[in-house]
Structure formats: structure tokens, C-alpha cells
Amino acid sequence: MTAIAPVITIDGPSGAGKGTLCKAMAEALQWHLLDSGAIYRVLALAALHHHVDLASEDALVPLASHLDVRFVSTDGNLEVILEGEDVSGEIRTQEVANAASQVAAFPRVREALLRRQRAFREAPGLIADGRDMGTVVFPDAPVKIFLDASSEERAHRRMLQLQENGFSVNFEHLLAEIKERDDRDRNRAVAPLVPAADALVLDSTRLSIEQVIEKALQYARQKLALA
């Protein structure tokens, strides 16, 4: 019998540094990578493109069931492909981010995408980036990490990111948006944003990304007995 491929789940709120950490770990271990948040963003973008009501679970479920999404790693970057088109940049807008959080609250939408996410589990292993990877999608994962940071730090990081891309932003407005999204994600009835009981909680507020990567890899290798 073929052994099931191992999974390292990285959960946490937006802006904690999950994406950077997951790419670094996938590269270090030479494993596959799943950006679960991107799947919800792709669904949200598809809904916006096809004028599907974001508040209608009945309308979103068929779209989720037939969503054509692929992840392609090229030169260290993760390309998100929707219906043959690279939408990596388009799904990172604030409009799509807010819409993704909205559609993710529907139980049947999550069920429709659950099977897609689990299908990414292939040898030699998978790094799964998301919000409920360790609690819902891969509850049997041998390594679970919950990456967190203060809302102020995450707002600051997001502000710098937007400014680097030429956008003018208001810190207080950004902070309020993040706190509102946190409240919605942490308190929703289905798959709320909480650490798995057996997860390592890693606070990145006062850590450099290099320190976060080092701590996460050390923990993962210890748990997996990888040299």
C-alpha cells in the first residue's frame, strides 16, 4: 500500500507572512505548494467576472464545483491559473480579498472546494497555506503551524506592500479593515480561524522573515525526522 504523502499546514490571518513562509519551505523541502486562500480568491474573481451574486450560496456552489484552477510554480513564483489565464495579480486586489472572505463563509461552498484542495496532496509532500488547513482540510497533517502577528503589524506590512506598488493608503483605514476581517473570520460558524489543538503557534510580530522560516523549518524537520 502506498504511503499517504505528508502535509505541513500553515494557517493564520492575512498579513502574517504565510505566503512567504510557505514558498520558502516548499523550496527548501522540494515539496508541492497549495495556496488555499488563492482558491477562494479565484472563486471570488470568477463570481465577479460572471456576475454571480456573492451573497447567494445557491449561485456560488455550481461555480465552485466546476472551478478550473491550477497552481504552477515558475522561477520561485506561484502562478494561479483560472481557465487557462494567469490571474496571479488580479486576485490580489482588496476587492477580491474582501469578496473571498465573504464567499468562504458559506458551508456548501467550502464543501465544493474541499475535495479540490485535498487533491493537491501528492508525493513527496505538500505545504498547505490557508486558514483552516490544519483544522478542517488536513486534520491528520503531521506538522501544523499557526502563524500570527498583531493587527497593527499586519496593517503596517500591508501598507508598505501597497505603497511599493504605487498605491496611496491610509493606515487607520487599513487597520480597521483588517480588524473587521479578523472578527468575521475568527467568529464565523463554519471553520473559524483558530489554531489546531496540535499546532505550533508562531508569532511573527517581532521576528524577521528569516527567523520565522528558520523556526518553522527546524520544527517541521524535527517532527518529520528530516535531515
Swiss-Prot record:
GO molecular function terms attached to this record: ATP binding; CMP kinase activity; dCMP kinase activity
The keyword Cytoplasm appears for this protein: yes
Name of the protein in its database record: Cytidylate kinase
Matches recorded under CDD domains: CMPK (cd02020)
Family: Belongs to the cytidylate kinase family. Type 1 subfamily.
Broad enzyme group: transferase
Source species, domain of life: Bacteria
Listed EC numbers: 2.7.4.25
Pfam families: Cytidylate_kin (PF02224)
Reactions the enzyme catalyzes: CMP + ATP = CDP + ADP; dCMP + ATP = dCDP + ADP
GO CC terms, sorted: cytosol
Organism: Salmonella paratyphi A (strain AKU_12601)
Organism taxonomic ancestry: Bacteria, Pseudomonadati, Pseudomonadota, Gammaproteobacteria, Enterobacterales
GO biological process annotation, one example: pyrimidine nucleotide metabolic process
Protein keywords: ATP-binding, Cytoplasm, Kinase, Nucleotide-binding, Transferase
Residues bound to ATP: 12-20
Subcellular location: Cytoplasm
